[in-house]
Amino acid sequence: MDKLNKLAVPAGEKFRKLQKMVHDIKKNESGIINKFKKFQNEQVALICKTGKDTWDRLKKKPPPSLPRRDYASEHADNEEEQWSDDFDSDYENPDGHSDSEMYVVPSEENPDDSYEPPPSEQEKKKIPSSFPISRGEYADNRTSHHQLPPINKPLPSTPSSALPRPKKPSLPSPAAKPKLPLKPRECSDDEDNYIVPVDNDDDNYIEPTESSTPPPAKPPVNRFMKPPAKSALPTPPKPSLASDMQEVYEVPEEEEELSPPPVTRFTKPLPATRAQNAEHSHMHSMTRESPKLDASRNILPLPRNRLHPKTDHEANNNDENHSFSNTQESKFPPGAAPSPLPRALKKTSNAVNPAKPCLPSRDTFTVNEDKPTAADRRRGSSHEFPLPPLPSGTPKSSLQKPLVLPKVPEAPSRALGTSPHSSISSISSTADQDAGVHSKAWYAATCDRKTAEDALYRSNKDGSFLIRKSSGQDSRQPYTLVVFYNRRVYNIPIRFIESTRQYALGREKCGEERFDSVAEIVENHQHTSLVLIDSQNNTKDSTKLKYIVRVS
């Protein structure tokens, strides 16, 4: 037992020490936490207080400061001193004192002192109000203006004296501050009549200023254009504007009686102009309906036929192509003819008016008889006979025929590849010989894009190809290489480079291969692979030209 007690005593002491240490630790920690919480609460309270102060300052705005007065007063000086003393602390107390001093004291002396700024503004408004009445309301108040001119004549000096008088009270208002409050009383009493600076007799002087002497002077300027009107005008304007308007109509009648020659001048040209207008209208209608228009429209295609063959002739250098372009393009100008028609009308009308209308129509339709002969090589000569009699009898029918012509060129344009005549075949044969494609097995002369693609799809062999004419019929891109590869058909344009007289595949690019003929392109790519680019799928393949496809 003794041993147990000896062992238990130190263990209990150690346990108590541990508890004490733990208690001290907890106590210290709680103190730190309490200090932190206390500091935090103090900061929060400070922030709340300052925030409340700022919020109050933002929410409760100080009263606005009073503007400086135009007049000097002893009370105002005292108030400024009070403002300077108490402005830092409170805004309410100085306002209370200033309000009591401002509005009570001047009301005892002069009740109108507090309302001095408004009348000064009204005085400013009076000056522009008198002027816009004369400028802006001259249309509405012409009766008042015409009733007043007799008053203006006996009193020429009064309006000049009335104008500076309203300016005087407006000018000293800022200068003499203490003296003004006496005058605004009259302004307040007579504001409606706008007679502030002038006596009761000034009504007669202000109205002429409103009527503004220049407006009545403007109508007499127009009336004084003739000398006899001067004697009659000064007497009538007294009664009213209606009388003025009546006299305006009476005076020219008197003038006509006094001076008959000017009346005859006005009366003679009037029927003459009407007759001339009628004659001119008939002449214009006759010229429009006459076959001269047909002549002008029939003459127009001729210079166009002379201009277009030059481009074809420069491109192909063949006389046969020149003759074919004449026959083919003789039908195109009527479609584009309406634009130069007015130019031709002006020329023909000036040249043909002295001559008879029948002669130019016959001459011009002889030219038209040559045109259908060239065009009838394709359509037949059945249209030659009705053309000469139609313009003389019915000009409208002749106008309709050139409109029908533009529809026809579609057939020859398509027929270039399908049913060529001897001239077309000779031109195409020379071009094919130059390109080296004439009588080649892989060249389909009369093949369009769809038939070529169908033929390649039927072959269904990678590397099968043929060459056809381009559907656009462009001299810079005369042929197209059609290649089948991987169940797709590629149409590769063959460009003709005019500067070097060579051929190349695809779009122009630096370092491209150029060949002297299309046959060389085919021979080259039968041995070397041809790059095929699919722009839709952004893929690139290559193949050689292996199998020739013939179109039946």
UniProtKB/Swiss-Prot annotation:
| Keywords associated with the record | B-cell activation, Cell membrane, Cytoplasm, Membrane, Phosphoprotein, SH2 domain
Q: Which Gene3D superfamilies match?
A: SH2 domain
Q: Posttranslational modification, per the record?
A: Following BCR activation, phosphorylated on tyrosine residues by SYK and LYN. When phosphorylated, serves as a scaffold to assemble downstream targets of antigen activation, including PLCG1, VAV1, GRB2 and NCK1. Phosphorylation is required for both Ca(2+) and MAPK signaling pathways. Phosphorylation of Tyr-103, Tyr-194 and Tyr-205 facilitates PLCG1 binding. Phosphorylation of Tyr-115 facilitates BTK binding. Phosphorylation of Tyr-91 facilitates VAV1 and NCK1 binding.
- Specify where it is mainly localized: cytoplasm
The record's annotation in SUPFAM superfamilies points to: SH2 domain (SSF55550)
* Quaternary assembly: Associates with PLCG1, VAV1 and NCK1 in a B-cell antigen receptor-dependent fashion. Interacts through its SH2 domain with CD79A. Interacts with VAV3, PLCG2 and GRB2.
**Which spans does this entry mark as compositional bias, Acidic residues?**
77-93, 188-205
Could you tell me the superkingdom of the organism this chain comes from? Eukaryota
Claim: Phosphoprotein is one of the keywords in the record? yes
Q: Basic and acidic residues: which segments have biased composition?
A: 67-76, 277-295, 309-322, 368-382
Output the Pfam families linked to this UniProt entry. SH2
Name of encoding gene: BLNK
Give compartment(s): Cytoplasm; Cell membrane
Annotated tissue distribution: Highly expressed in the bursa, very low expression in ovary and spleen. Expression was variable among B-cell lines. Highly expressed in immature B-cell lines such as DT40 and CL18, low expression was seen in relatively mature B-cell lines, such as 293B9 and 249L4. No expression was seen in T-cell lines.
Stated role: Functions as a central linker protein, downstream of the B-cell receptor (BCR), bridging the SYK kinase to a multitude of signaling pathways and regulating biological outcomes of B-cell function and development. Plays a role in the activation of ERK/EPHB2, MAP kinase p38 and JNK. Modulates AP1 activation. Important for the activation of NF-kappa-B and NFAT. Plays an important role in BCR-mediated PLCG1 and PLCG2 activation and Ca(2+) mobilization and is required for trafficking of the BCR to late endosomes.
Where Phosphotyrosine occurs along the chain?
91, 103, 115, 194, 205, 249
Annotated region described as Disordered, given as residue ranges: 50-431
Q: What is this protein called?
A: B-cell linker protein
Entry GO MF terms: lipase binding
InterPro entries given for it? Immunoreceptor_sig_adapters (IPR051751), SH2 (IPR000980), SH2_dom_sf (IPR036860)
Which effect does the record note for changing residue 205 to F? Answer: Loss of Ca(2+) mobilization. Significant phosphorylation reduction. Loss of phosphorylation
**Outcome of altering residue 249 to F?**
Loss of phosphorylation
The residues covered by the SH2 domain are 442-549
GO cellular component terms, semicolon-separated: cytoplasm; cytosol; plasma membrane
Single GO BP term: regulation of cell cycle
